[in-house]
């Protein structure tokens, strides 16, 4: 009986309804599965791999048709299973063939296989995989039987099983993907949203300051993608300091993207706080445009007295470091020398490279650029904290010993460098004496506690003097250049190491939201029963454009009594044929061609009219041909009229 039903009630192959398409997709899947089970895959592995690939494609096609049925029956998303968890998945997981891979994975788990290196997770989700495959088999039987009865109707049993399968499949998708790849937690997702909020505020502020134009955003210029993370670091540390880049909290509370750069962000914030408004504007411009030559105001130029003051401060810092190294062990001195040489070489290489974006190295390379200034900063913190607790009495012998060592070193340097002035030598000697006294007082004070307290790297440095911090840079351009290299380095490493997260954040703030038109019905009457309401809904849906997978609307048979092309009337011999491309009715002579139309869901060749066939083969020559045919028709009609007039005149 089932075979007779298949023969007489089998849907047409070119039918666009989901149930009719499901019938043939399920039949193709069964044929591939039976062929795969009929031979030993170890003897012919190439054929086995090809069949497995075809099987997964067929499974994916069946699941897509089932999804179309769910969307057709339940247009609202809240009526179907929730899949908001997909926002936690990586971008490489979300693709069109994901449903087929999930079905294949569920069958493998049901058969007893395990996910590689995830045996424990496989045992946990195996019962759910068995339930999914069982429910899918039941649903396939119901849909196939219904396609043989009436492909245009869905009974309540099918609707109930569709919803049940949708819920089970969504739950299996989350557990299976979570076992395969790392999925973000709620805290990590909230941190990513905080970064999106920060970048959105940065984009608005950049538009107000004319750093980024609306045309660049509309055309998705790459410079916008580069400038937003850079400006986000600057304004996230200065303007929106309580947001995603709040470095006053522990590093664990930051986003996963900025967590490796926590210590470097603290140093960048300290340098940003000493910038003048002119320097900050110059830094923002350089970060956005990458210009090596930025116009400089006359007020920001250094005079000779300022340069001498900066040089004196630098020499003072060097003398402080030299005297401090007199009391350090040889191993510590050698390690400090190596660090200073590394930082100096790094600064030299960066200065020679100009205002260009640094390569995406590690955080240690970026930290090394501010290492020298940071060491001097630690010395000043120790000196300031210790000078407040300095005792009145001091050891004069130790002072003289350290001072004499400083004098001898200065004498040797003066013998080598004859160009130095006498005033500068006296200044340096006085600084050496003063520094030696302070260091001896520090050592005498902390001998009771047997250790010197040095502030940690991640602790907020409240004792930083902006004047001393600024004096460590040669000029204002040097400070801006150092900040540019550090900020651009962090931003470029974000683009390289966290490209997926950055792409998601930029997509949130740059992609325009989809606008759904809302139609208002004026003087509408409320339906009295559910039947009228359902008819109103169907009538409203008729005016909306159909999706591509549903094909085109066919002209009803009763509305056309003759061929659309040749105008010959239809009879018992001359039958009606619909064109699958335009939906109009033609005779057999005017629709004898066949082509495939993938955009309408016809992968195999189907019947089309002659005009659509010519247009598909040569879309540019179709208009010329139609115009030529119209001209020939006009000429023939004129000839017929002239001959008729001649006949009437002769008669």
Swiss-Prot record:
GO terms for molecular function: zinc ion binding. Residues 294-425 are annotated as: Disordered. Residues 345-363, 395-412 have a biased composition (Low complexity). Zn(2+) 2 binds at residues 579, 582, 609, 612. The keyword Cell membrane does not apply. Zn(2+) 1 binds at residues 563, 566, 587, 590. It comes from the Eukaryota. GO terms for cellular component: early endosome membrane. A zinc finger (FYVE-type) spans 557-617. Residues 300-310 have a biased composition (Polar residues). One of its GO terms (biological process) is negative regulation of epidermal growth factor receptor signaling pathway. Keywords: Metal-binding, Zinc, Zinc-finger. Pfam families: FYVE (PF01363). Residues 373-394 have a biased composition (Acidic residues). The keyword Zinc applies. Negative regulator of epidermal growth factor receptor (EGFR) signaling. Belongs to the lst-2 family. This is Lateral signaling target protein 2. The gene is lst-2.
């Amino acid at each position: 009986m089932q075979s007779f039903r298949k023969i007489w009630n089998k849907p047409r192959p070119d039918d666009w309804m989901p149930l009719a398409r499901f019938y043939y997709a399920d039949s193709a899947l069964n044929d591939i599965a039976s062929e795969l089970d009929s031979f030993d895959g170890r003897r012919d592995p190439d054929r086995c791999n090809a069949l497995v690939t075809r099987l997964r494609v067929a499974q994916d096609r069946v699941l897509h048709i089932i999804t179309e049925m769910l969307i057709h029956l339940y247009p609202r998303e809240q009526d179907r299973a929730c899949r908001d968890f997909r926002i936690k998945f990586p971008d490489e997981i979300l693709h069109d063939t994901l449903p087929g891979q999930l079905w294949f994975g569920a069958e493998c788990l049901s058969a007893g296989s395990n996910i590689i290196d995830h045996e424990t997770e496989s045992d946990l989700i195996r019962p759910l995989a068995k339930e999914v495959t069982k429910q899918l088999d039941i649903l396939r039987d119901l849909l196939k039987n219904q396609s043989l009865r009436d492909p245009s109707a869905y009974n309540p049993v099918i609707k109930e099983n569709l919803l049940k399968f949708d819920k089970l499949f969504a739950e299996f998708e989350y557990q299976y993907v979570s076992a395969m790849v790392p999925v973000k937690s709620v805290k990590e997702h909230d941190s990513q949203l905080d970064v999106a909020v920060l970048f959105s505020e940065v984009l608005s502020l950049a538009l107000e300051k004319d750093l980024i134009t609306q045309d660049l955003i509309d055309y998705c210029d790459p410079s916008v993608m580069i400038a937003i993370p850079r400006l986000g670091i600057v304004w996230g540390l200065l303007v929106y300091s309580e947001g995603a880049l709040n470095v006053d909290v522990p590093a664990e509370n930051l986003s996963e993207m900025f967590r490796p750069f926590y210590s470097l962000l603290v140093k960048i914030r300290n340098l940003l706080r000493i910038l003048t408004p002119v320097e900050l504007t110059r830094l923002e411009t350089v970060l956005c445009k990458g210009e090596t030559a930025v116009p400089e105001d006359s007020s920001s130029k250094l005079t000779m007295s300022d340069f001498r003051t900066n040089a004196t401060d630098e020499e003072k810092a060097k003398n402080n470091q030299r005297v401090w190294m007199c009391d350090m062990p040889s191993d510590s001195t050698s390690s400090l020398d190596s660090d200073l040489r590394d930082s100096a070489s790094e600064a030299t290489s960066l200065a020679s490279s100009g205002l260009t974006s640094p390569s995406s190295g590690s955080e240690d390379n970026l930290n090394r650029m501010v290492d020298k200034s940071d060491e001097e900063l630690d010395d000043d913190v120790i000196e300031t904290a210790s000078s407040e607790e300095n005792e009145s009495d001091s050891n004069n012998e130790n002072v003289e010993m350290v001072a004499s060592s400083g004098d001898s070193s200065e004498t040797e340097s003066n013998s080598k460098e004859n160009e130095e002035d006498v005033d500068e030598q006296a200044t340096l000697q006085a600084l050496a004496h003063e520094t030696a006294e302070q260091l001896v007082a520090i050592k005498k004070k902390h001998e009771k506690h047997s250790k010197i307290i040095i502030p940690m790297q991640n602790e907020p440095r409240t004792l930083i003097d902006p004047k001393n911090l600024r004096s460590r840079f040669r000029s204002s351009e040097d400070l801006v250049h150092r900040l540019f290299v550090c900020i651009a380095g962090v931003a470029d490493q974000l683009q390289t190491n966290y490209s997926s997260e950055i792409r998601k954040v930029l997509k949130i703030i740059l992609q325009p939201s989809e606008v759904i038109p809302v139609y208002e019905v004026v003087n509408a009457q409320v339906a009295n029963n559910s039947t009228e309401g359902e008819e109103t809904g169907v009538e409203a849906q008729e005016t909306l454009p159909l999706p591509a997978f549903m094909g085109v609307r066919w002209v009803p048979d009763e509305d056309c009594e003759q061929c659309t092309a040749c105008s010959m009337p239809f009879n018992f011999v001359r039958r009606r044929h619909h064109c699958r491309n335009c939906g109009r009715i033609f005779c057999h002579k005017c629709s004898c061609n066949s082509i495939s139309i993938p955009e309408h869901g016809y992968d195999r060749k189907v019947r089309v009219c002659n005009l659509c066939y010519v247009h598909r083969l040569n879309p540019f020559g179709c208009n010329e041909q139609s115009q030529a045919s119209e001209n020939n028709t006009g000429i023939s009609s004129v000839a017929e009229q002239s001959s008729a007039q001649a006949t009437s005149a002769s008669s």
